[in-house]
Design a protein with these regions (language model features):
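Threonine-centered tandem repeat motifs in low-complexity domains
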Residues: 4-6, 16
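Active-site cofactor/cluster-binding pocket
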Residues: 2, 19-188
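Periodic low-complexity repeat segments enriched in small/acidic residues
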Residues: 13-14, 26
């Protein structure tokens, strides 16, 4: 048992993924137990990144994890949607030991649109996990973010573990039985 936070960190760093990975026979998925992780949620201001980050943080705390957060939102009153100036983010470091900071570089980046990807990709750790809202990656949003071509096709993301999720489609499907206007559905 570690006596100080420094010893806890040393013990945690000493573990390799091979030591903490186990195979679940029931669903044939690999489960990886890690001592600490830093996650950053990024999207347009108004997309709910602060709310998502807060809910994620609250849920993690319920499970007894230590955590530190870093909300970030633009100083502009309302920058144009889909632009880098309008990107808001929420970073949380979660650990099974005492931590004092929200982490430096995220291990996981959840990018809700191309502008969020452009604003935060440079911070993602090598071989980090990148979760993209594939529904937002249309030609208009890609161009507005300042990309010359779709970053998913350019090779720029090759050094990351990329997961594309149709978040808008899934949200619409989950809320189809509620009497909500289209715009409210995407803000839910």
């Amino acid at each position: 048992v570690a006596e100080t936070p420094a010893e806890v960190v040393e013990e945690s760093v000493a573990e390799t993924p091979a030591e903490v990975v186990e195979e679940s026979e029931a669903d044939n998925k690999t489960v990886e137990s890690i001592p600490a992780i830093t996650i950053r949620f990024a999207g347009d201001s108004g997309d709910g990144m602060q709310l998502v980050g807060t809910r994620f943080t609250d849920t993690s705390a319920i499970f007894g994890n230590d955590l530190a957060t870093l909300p970030s939102f633009p100083a502009e009153i309302r920058a144009p949607q889909g632009t880098i100036a309008g990107v808001s983010s929420f970073q949380v470091q979660i650990a099974d030991f005492d931590i004092l900071t929200p982490g430096d570089n995220p291990d996981v980046l959840v990018a809700m649109n191309p502008a969020a990807l452009k604003a935060h990709l440079h911070d993602l750790t090598p071989n980090g996990m990148l979760i993209l809202n594939e529904d937002a990656f249309d030609e208009k949003n890609i161009t507005k973010a300042g990309y010359k071509m779709d970053p998913r096709d350019s090779g720029e993301l090759d050094s990351y573990r990329v997961f594309q999720v149709p978040m808008e489609k899934l949200t619409k499907e989950a809320l189809k039985d509620f009497d909500l206007p289209g715009r409210a559905v995407l803000r839910s």
